């Protein structure tokens, strides 16, 4: 089970201070803003076990008016708390710039850390080689490349995605990309 606390969805809105304006036990301090995510995680762990639960985070907070005044503190706290619960993994959507939080989140969590966000083969290999991630996740890249693992393994050309068709109803833009021969 992956608990989705990213991309401006409800748990992410509670976590980040740009959207959480509450004044009760679920607002204000980092601990309070993280409360709902941790309660949901604890409930999932109680049902499925820690080894079957992961959490998806969006430390960049750049979607749907999201943001946090101190993402290092907020997401560092969350990573540490999730680490105490010994869940299976955290997957973090984050940029590859100098100010990225991935290595700090991985260290605070202490478990399997999956890096995600516009990965390329080169970026993925580099993150894995230097130990900044235990695994990488490819999201949108799969939409235009249903045979992505094979293409990466063979250093084959990559289909150009058509972002205007992402999340469009019907098969066009999902199942009409050519596969390798």
Describe every region a protein language model picked out:
Residues 1-181:
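Flavin-dependent oxidoreductase catalytic cores
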């Amino acid at each position: 089970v992956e608990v989705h606390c990213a991309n401006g969805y409800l748990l992410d809105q509670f976590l980040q201070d740009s959207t959480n304006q509450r004044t009760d036990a679920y607002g204000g301090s980092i601990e309070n803003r993280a409360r709902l995510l941790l309660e949901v995680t604890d409930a999932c762990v109680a049902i499925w076990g820690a080894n079957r639960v992961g959490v998806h985070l969006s430390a960049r907070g750049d979607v749907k008016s999201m943001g946090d005044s101190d993402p290092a503190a907020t997401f560092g706290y969350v990573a540490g708390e999730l680490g105490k619960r010994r869940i299976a993994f955290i997957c973090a959507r984050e940029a590859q710039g100098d100010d990225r939080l991935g290595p700090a989140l991985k260290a605070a969590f202490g478990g399997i850390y999956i890096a995600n966000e516009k990965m390329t083969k080169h970026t993925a290999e580099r993150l894995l080689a230097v130990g900044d991630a235990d695994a990488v996740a490819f999201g949108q890249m799969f939409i235009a490349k249903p045979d992505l693992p094979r293409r990466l393994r063979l250093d084959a050309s990559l289909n150009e995605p058509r972002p205007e068709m992402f999340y469009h109803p019907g098969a066009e833009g999902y199942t009409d990309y050519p596969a390798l021969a």
